[in-house]
Regions:
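Short beta-edge strand/loop motif at the mouth of beta-sheet-based domains
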Residues: 28-69
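A conserved amphipathic terminal alpha-helix motif
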Residues: 91, 118-149
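Hydrophobic-ligand binding "helix-grip"
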Residues: 50, 60-109, 118
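Hydrophobic ligand-binding cavity/cleft-lining segments
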Residues: 1-45
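A structural signal for short, well-ordered beta-strand segments
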Residues: 9-13, 102, 115-117
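Hydrophobic pocket/interface hotspot
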Residues: 22-23, 59, 74, 85, ...
Length: 149
């Protein structure tokens, strides 16, 4: 099967934690596990990434020199089961109109976490060229998350 630059990226992992813990690690402890030096806007100048309330929740990356950029805004969530947000690190939501959705489902003694990164069909050709990098990058990011959970 040939993958086009507009298909939804879908990743699924199992974490050895309850859905509540898995959700909290992703949202409340993201600064502790996200590989900012490789997957961040500021790279080696990155200082932190955190969800914060800005008249609605947003995921914000900060650089050591005080600069900041919003990676995305939370559209909706259900604690311990679902998180959906816009996704546009280093760009405006208009430039990169993609979104991610994570679901957290109890699975035996752990949780199955599914990430879908969609909306590529609304993106410009320039943004679509980043899709392959995200497809590979989400594997590494989620493995780092799994190890932290």
């Amino acid at each position: 099967m040939t993958v086009t630059a507009t298909e939804t990226i879908r990743k699924e992992i199992f974490v050895d934690a309850s859905p509540e813990t898995a959700f909290r690690v992703f949202t409340e402890q993201i600064a502790e596990w996200w590989p900012l030096g490789k997957y961040g806007t500021f790279l080696e100048q990155a200082d932190s990434v955190v969800f914060e309330d800005r008249d609605g929740w947003a995921l914000v990356e900060r650089a050591k020199d005080g600069r900041e950029t919003v990676w995305g805004e939370v559209l909706d969530y259900e604690f311990s089961s679902r998180l959906r947000m816009t996704w546009h690190p280093g760009r405006s939501a208009d430039e990169m109109p993609t979104e991610i959705e994570l679901t957290f489902a109890a699975d035996g003694d752990g949780t199955t976490v599914v990430l879908e990164h969609r909306g590529w069909e609304r993106a410009s050709d320039e943004v679509r060229t980043a899709r392959a990098g995200y497809d590979a990058g989400w594997n590494e990011v989620l493995e780092t998350y799994r190890n932290a959970s």
